[in-house]
Structure formats: C-alpha cells, structure tokens
C-alpha cells in the first residue's frame, strides 16, 4: 500500500499572492499535486463540468453534508454555499496523491480541526506597506475597502501561530520553491513513513534494555 498523500492547506491575507504562488507551484512537473475541487450550490454555467470545475449540488444536498460532518470547510456567499467535500479529499489522499487546498484563514482553521495532520502553510507579505501597494495595484477596490482588507490582514497574520509554516512572498518563484521544499520535507517525517515498514520489522523486545 502506498503512502497516503499529504493535505497541504495554503492560505494568507487577501492580496498576498496566494493564487499566483500556487500557479507557480503547479507549473513545474517535479511533484504531483491534485488541486482540490470545491463544491457549490450555485447553478452550473455553460461549459462547466461537474467534478472538474466544481461539484454541483442542491442546497438540500449540501446542507445534509454539513449536518453529517462531510464538509472540510464551507461558507455561504451571495446566497450560495461553497466548500470542500471531505470524501473527495480523503479518496484522493488514499491514492497517495497530495491534495493542495488554497483557502482563506478561517476556512483553514476549520480544516485543521478535522485534519490535524495536514500541512498548514501561511503565506505572508514582507510587510503591510507592501501588501497595501499590491492591493492598490489591483485597481479593483476603493481606499475604504483596501483599509478594511489591511485591518483584516492584521487579524489573520495574528493567527499565523496556528500554522505549521510561514512563507514570505517577497518573490513569487522563491516563495513557490520554499513551499515545495516544505512539502518534500514533510514526506520524510518519521510519523508519516513508519507505517510502510511495519511488515519489514517486528520488534519483540528492546535490544538495548539491560538484562
């Protein structure tokens, strides 16, 4: 049986560059990842494929999954639910494939309560001035909204202590490389690999124990 895959939970403040860094990570073929497919109750749009773009479900089906604890994390936005189905993630991990989940901080904390052995990586800006410059550079938000995002970022950065690793996004390629090294290292943690040797070793007594 192959080693179970890792659940990599990747999050950070709005504007920190999560999507850009994730795309850089996925652009190289040196590691196989599965990007987690989200579930939603919003209507399926032309060209979208169930199980590829989203898992499309009715509101009743989604709420039943919430009730029975089958959602890793979820939120309601503009009248529709969005979230990460637990079954899909577990089935993929059981195949030995790493699952990469890019979500907001509150969602990441929901996931940690259900999958504590996941790898939780927090992407942080070099400083708040840099983060503000990036938000302004987007050209999509008013100054009021940007100020709100900065305040939210402060709150989220304070939650960094809940994560396993913090990666500074000072340069996209470097940040992506740091994340990949973290994942590679996690695959060699003793508690993750000892299971594969269970059939190879049978310890009946401690050879170093004094007689």
UniProtKB/Swiss-Prot annotation:
It catalyses: GMP + ATP = GDP + ADP. Coiled coil: none annotated. It is an enzyme of class 2 (transferase). Disulfide bonds: none annotated. It comes from the Bacteria. CDD domains: GMPK. It is found in: Cytoplasm. Its EC number is 2.7.4.8. InterPro entries: GK/Ca_channel_bsu, Guanylate_kin-like_dom, Guanylate_kinase, Guanylate_kinase_CS, P-loop_NTPase. Residues 5-184 form the Guanylate kinase-like domain. GO terms for cellular component: cytosol. The keyword Kinase applies. SMART domains: GuKc (SM00072). Gene3D superfamilies: Guanylate Kinase phosphate binding domain, P-loop containing nucleotide triphosphate hydrolases. Keywords: ATP-binding, Cytoplasm, Kinase, Nucleotide-binding, Transferase. Its main location: cytoplasm. Belongs to the guanylate kinase family. Essential for recycling GMP and indirectly, cGMP. This is Guanylate kinase. It comes from Streptococcus pyogenes serotype M3 (strain ATCC BAA-595 / MGAS315). The lineage of its organism: Bacteria, Bacillati, Bacillota, Bacilli, Lactobacillales.
């Amino acid at each position: 049986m192959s080693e179970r895959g890792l659940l990599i939970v990747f999050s950070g403040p709005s504007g920190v560059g999560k999507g850009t860094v994730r795309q850089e990570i996925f652009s190289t073929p040196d590691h196989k990842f599965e990007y987690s497919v989200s579930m939603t109750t919003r209507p399926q749009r032309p060209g979208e494929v169930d199980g590829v773009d989203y898992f499309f479900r009715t509101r009743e089906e989604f709420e039943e999954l919430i009730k029975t604890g089958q959602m890793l994390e979820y939120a309601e936005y503009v009248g529709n639910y969005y979230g990460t189905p637990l079954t899909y993630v577990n089935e993929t991990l059981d195949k030995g494939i790493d699952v990469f989940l890019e979500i907001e901080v509150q969602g990441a904390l929901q996931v940690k309560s259900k999958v504590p052995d996941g790898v939780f990586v927090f992407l942080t800006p070099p400083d708040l001035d840099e983060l503000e410059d990036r938000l302004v550079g987007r050209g999509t938000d008013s100054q009021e909204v940007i100020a709100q995002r900065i305040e939210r970022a402060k709150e989220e950065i304070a939650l960094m202590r809940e994560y396993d690793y913090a990666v500074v996004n000072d340069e996209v390629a470097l940040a992506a490389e740091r994340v990949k090294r973290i994942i590679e290292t996690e695959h060699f943690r003793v508690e993750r690999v000892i299971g594969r040797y269970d059939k190879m070793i049978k310890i009946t007594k401690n050879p170093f124990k004094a007689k």
